[in-house]
C-alpha cells in the first residue's frame, strides 16, 4: 500500500514523454494507443527508478552492492518529481537518522577527541582518564563483544565523575547526553520510593530494551548508584552477564553501563593522603594502591545494596575507576575553565581568590577540596562587574 501511494505521488508531477530535458512550453503529442503498452513499461521503469533513488537517499550503503547501474530512461526526472522525492525523504528522516555516508550518524566514536578532552578538560584524574580511555577504546575496537562494558566510577562529590561521563558521551555520540542512544537515571530522582520498585523495574526494562533495539551502541548511566534498590540492581544483571556460547557467533548490539557513586570516596582520600605524606607524587599513584581497599569498602558498605549485589558478586563490573580528591591547583584550573566557558575575562588574582573560597580538608593539611569543583560557577557570579 505504501509503495502504491508512493508510485502515484511520484508520477503525478511527470511531464509527457519527449526529448530529454524538454521544457514544459514545448508541447509533444501523447502516444497513440499502439504505443500505450510501451509507455506503461517506461512508467513502471521510472517508478522503479524513483524507488531506487529514494532508498539510496536514505540507505546509501545498500546501493554500493548494485553490480549494474540503472540504465537511462527515455523520460527525464522532472523537477517536481525530484521535489516529491525530497519531501518524502525529509518526512521519513524525521523518524530515522539519515546519513550521507551510510551507517548510524548518531554514533561518532571520536576516540581521538576523547583522548584530547580527557587530557585538557579533566583535571587531577590521571588514573580515571587512562583507565576509561583504555577500556572504552578496547571495547569499541573489538570485532565482536562477549558482554556489555560496565564501568563503576567512585570518589568524592565534585571530583569529576559526571563530568567524565559527559565528556565520554560528547565524543561517542553526536548529540552527547541528549542522544537517543543514551539514557541517564538518577536514583533519588527516577526511583525515589521503594514501594514503587515493581513499577520502576517495568519502566527501566522498557526503556533499556527500546534503546538497545533503536541503537546498535547504547549507553546507560546510573548516577547515585549506591542508592539503587536491590530489585533494580538484580534487574540489571542479565544485561551485564556474558553472552552464551551459542549466541557469540551472532553480532550483538554494544552497550556501555556507567555507575557513578560516592562509595569508596573516603578510603580513596585516606590512601592518597598517606602516599602524599610518604613522599609520593600524585602522578605516581597507581590503581594497585587503590584497587583492594576501594573494593573492600564498596562491598562492606552497610547502607548500600550496591556492594552486596550480584553485579559485584558475579564480577560483572569490568573496571572500578577511582577519582582522586582535588587539590588547590586543580580547583584553580576549574575556575579558569568556568570563566573561559562563559567567555568572561579574568585575572590570576581572581582565580586565586575564588579557589581559596573553597573548603579544604583535613583540617591540619588542608590539601583536598571538600566539594571538589562543585559550586564554582555560582562563585564566579560574585566577581562579575
Curated annotation (Swiss-Prot):
* Sites carrying sugar chains: 110
Cellular location(s): Cytoplasm; Endoplasmic reticulum lumen
Keyword Cytoplasm applies = yes
Q: Where is the signal peptide?
A: 1-21
Induction details = By interferon-alpha and interferon-gamma, in spleen and liver.
Q: Which domain of life is it from?
A: Eukaryota
Q: Where does ATP bind?
A: 155-162
* S-S bridge residues: none
Q: What does the UniProt PTM comment say about this protein?
A: N-glycosylated.
Gene3D superfamilies named among the record's database cross-references: P-loop containing nucleotide triphosphate hydrolases
Q: Record's InterPro entries? A: ClpA/B, P-loop_NTPase, TOR1A_C, Torsin
**GO cellular component, as recorded:** endoplasmic reticulum lumen
Question: What are this entry's molecular-function GO terms?
Answer: ATP binding; ATP hydrolysis activity
Keywords in alphabetical order, please: ATP-binding, Cytoplasm, Endoplasmic reticulum, Glycoprotein, Nucleotide-binding, Signal
Q: Which family is annotated?
A: Belongs to the ClpA/ClpB family. Torsin subfamily.
Subunit structure, per the record?
Answer: Interacts with TOR1AIP1.
Name under which the protein is recorded: Torsin-3A
User: What's the source species' lineage?
Assistant: Eukaryota, Metazoa, Chordata, Craniata, Vertebrata
This chain is encoded by the gene named Tor3a
